[in-house]
From Swiss-Prot:
Protein source organism: Drosophila willistoni
Summary of the function given for this chain in its UniProt record: Component of the eukaryotic translation initiation factor 3 (eIF-3) complex, which is involved in protein synthesis of a specialized repertoire of mRNAs and, together with other initiation factors, stimulates binding of mRNA and methionyl-tRNAi to the 40S ribosome. The eIF-3 complex specifically targets and initiates translation of a subset of mRNAs involved in cell proliferation.
UniProt-listed GO biological process terms: antibacterial innate immune response; defense response to Gram-negative bacterium; formation of cytoplasmic translation initiation complex; positive regulation of Notch signaling pathway; positive regulation of peptidoglycan recognition protein signaling pathway
Quaternary data: Component of the eukaryotic translation initiation factor 3 (eIF-3) complex. The eIF-3 complex interacts with pix.
Keyword Repressor in record: no
Subcellular location: Cytoplasm
Similarity-based family: Belongs to the eIF-3 subunit F family.
One GO CC term on file: eukaryotic translation initiation factor 3 complex, eIF3m
Protein name per the record: Eukaryotic translation initiation factor 3 subunit F-1
Length: 280
């Protein structure tokens, strides 16, 4: 498969590790680089982990601790044997002159390595994320070179990662003095209420976007339109009475599960107290 047909999917933990490595960099380091770990399947490069590689960049050369990178990879293989080298990352919003030299090393470690750049300067208030592959250029018998070509990149996450991100969002904007050290699990009904409130706010946002497009206040985006059409087609066709009946049945089932779980919890607590009662 051609390298240009690859798509990169990056997990949140990778971005957290990149930012952490950037914050811990040496004072004389302008950027940080590291190894990307993950898997490749059917043209999709899924990046699930990474680590930093110490290096120094000079005007005419790059010094990287390759032995450190090899040791880190071997240690990671003992814990996550399904993760392999898929490319490398660097902080910044552009490809530098030294990028081709670093890419040559990773080209020996894996087939079609990808290069991901993370803009930790937060230009425009966003963390820019880009992915590249290196395409060989040249003529037979002449000089050859390479060119970094952008490829699609997107963020993805497993369900536990999504849940963790939602918990982190609750502490955004909270001062350290008032920030809770622990986040207790929410009750089932509280989770339903919170999810319903968020769904209502998202629906209001979509309706506002559609109204602005109809009023020619916003330039329409074909990709957004196709996604909205897919959402409409995904909604099951049923009457209001059928939906109400189905919703009420699910709520009754949920309440029954909550009641039974509370009874089991009470029984376990009572059994624990009876077990530790002093015997005459």
């Amino acid at each position: 498969m051609s390298a240009l047909n690859l798509t990169v999917r990056v997990h949140p933990v990778v971005l957290f590790q990149v930012v952490d490595a950037f914050e811990r960099r040496n004072a004389d380091s302008h950027r940080v680089i590291g190894t990307l770990l993950g898997s490749v399947d059917k043209g999709v490069v899924e990046v699930t982990n990474c680590f930093c590689v110490p290096h120094k960049e000079h005007d005419d050369q790059v010094e990287a601790e390759l032995s450190y990178a090899l040791d880190m990879y071997e240690l990671n293989r003992k814990v996550n044997s399904n993760e392999s080298v898929v490319g490398w990352w660097a902080t910044g919003n552009e490809v530098t002159n030294h990028s081709s030299v670093i890419h040559e090393y990773y080209a020996r470690e894996c087939n079609n390595p990808v290069h991901v750049t993370v803009d930790t300067s937060l230009q425009g208030g966003r963390m820019g994320l880009r992915a590249y592959v290196c395409i060989q250029l040249g003529v037979p018998g002449g000089k050859s070179g390479c060119m970094f070509t952008p490829i699609p990149v997107e963020l993805t996450s497993y369900e536990p990662e999504t849940f963790g991100l939602k918990l982190l969002q609750k502490t955004v904007g909270v001062s350290p003095a008032h920030r809770p050290k622990t986040v207790p699990p929410m009750l089932d009904l509280a989770q339903i209420s919170e999810a319903s409130t968020k769904l209502q706010s998202l629906l209001d946002l979509i309706l506002k976007y559609v109204d602005d497009v109809i009023a020619h206040k916003v330039t329409p985006d074909n990709a957004v339109g196709r996604q909205l059409l897919d959402l409409i087609h995904a909604v099951p066709h049923m009457t209001h009475e059928q939906f109400t009946q189905m919703f009420n049945a699910n709520v009754r089932d949920l309440l029954m599960v909550i009641t039974l779980s509370q009874l089991i919890k009470t029984q376990l607590q009572l059994n624990e107290k009876l077990t530790f009662l002093p015997t005459a």
